[in-house]
Regions:
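Conserved serine/cysteine hydrolase catalytic core
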Residues: 178-238, 247
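Alpha/beta-hydrolase fold catalytic core
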Residues: 1-25, 45-47, 86, 260-261, ...
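Catalytic histidine-centered segment of alpha/beta-hydrolase-like enzymes
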Residues: 248-260
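Conserved hydrolase catalytic core segment
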Residues: 87-126
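Conserved alpha/beta-hydrolase catalytic His-Asp/Glu region
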Residues: 143-196
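A catalytic-pocket lid/entrance helix-loop region that shapes and gates access to the active site
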Residues: 120-147
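Active-site loop/oxyanion-hole signature of alpha/beta-hydrolase fold enzymes
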Residues: 41, 50-92
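Conserved HGGG/HGGXW glycine-rich cap/lid loop of the alpha/beta-hydrolase fold
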Residues: 11-62
């Protein structure tokens, strides 16, 4: 069972804190939970792994669409570190979690030991956002985990060589079986928050990436990603030639993090920040 604390505004935040040593704060994707990092965990060296469910996701409390923002989630992450008495942490951010990590570099640079980004960068491709908008906040049409697992390869284009057991695990982690069918594991109001941020011209996020100056940075990119282009990854590497980076074959958005290429980058990143 996860532990909990209350954010400054009173919202219940669920988290998991296990191990000793280097603190690694793991921040999940937009609609996902701390379970995002279950596949990676057995491959990590001894360290202190800290995970959280953002407000409105998983076991955390719901606080309304207006509060489901990257800034609020960054503030909640800092509140969690304060609650745990952690002065500095390395951050591993998947998708939305990487955006939070870059924002933390800008607003709380002294709290970070480094940032490892999983398939996200300063330019978010419209194609990926459009795909996400098709499903965010909606319960799947599939009625069972097994049925959803069978459909996942069709919906997750760009993935190959993924065993059926992995798709079933994904279905079980990110939906709940009920008598009425499968239910999403987050507040449906997240859709309103996402669509509100989807409107208008995209924000310039390069200043957030540049705010990582002085911190070790690593990048894991799904070779077939529709959210992070190769051109953006190349520009990130041009700005940070010391960035540890890889493309993960047979993966789109997002790599599972237990691929050999992902594990290699994460281990190298941890060696640098340790």
């Amino acid at each position: 069972m996860p532990q909990t604390f209350h954010a400054p505004d009173g919202t219940l935040i669920a988290y998991d804190d296990q191990g000793i040593g280097l603190p690694l704060l793991c921040l999940a994707g937009l609609t996902r939970t701390m379970a995002d990092f279950d596949y990676l965990r057995p491959h990590l060296p001894p360290l202190r792994m800290i995970r959280m469910d953002y407000r409105g996701r998983g076991a955390s409390g719901h606080s309304g669409a207006a509060s489901y923002t990257v800034l609020q989630e960054a503030q909640d992450a800092l509140a969690l570190l304060d609650h745990l008495g952690v002065k500095k942490a390395a951050v591993l951010g998947t998708s939305r979690g990487g955006l939070i990590g870059m924002l933390l570099a800008a607003i709380a640079h002294d709290r970070l030991l480094g940032l490892c980004l999983n398939d996200v960068g300063p330019v978010i491709e419209r194609a990926g956002l459009t795909r996400i908008s098709d499903y965010v906040g909606r319960n799947p049409a599939a009625r069972t985990h097994a049925e959803l697992a069978e459909l996942m390869p069709r919906f997750n284009t760009g993935f190959a060589n993924v065993p059926p057991a992995r798709w079933l695990a994904e279905a079980q982690k990110h939906t709940t079986q009920t008598d009425a069918g499968l239910q999403i594991t987050y507040d449906p109001a997240l859709r309103d928050a996402f669509l509100a941020g989807f409107q208008g011209s995209p924000a310039d996020l390069w200043p957030l990436f540049d705010a990582c100056a002085g911190l070790p940075v690593a990048l894991i990119r799904g070779a077939n990603s529709d959210l992070l282009s190769q051109a953006t990854a190349d520009e990130m590497l041009r700005r940070r030639p010391d960035m540890i980076a890889t493309n993960v074959p047979d993966r789109a958005h997002i790599p599972f993090l237990d691929e050999l290429e992902s594990i290699d980058v994460i281990h190298k990143f941890l060696e640098v920040v340790a």
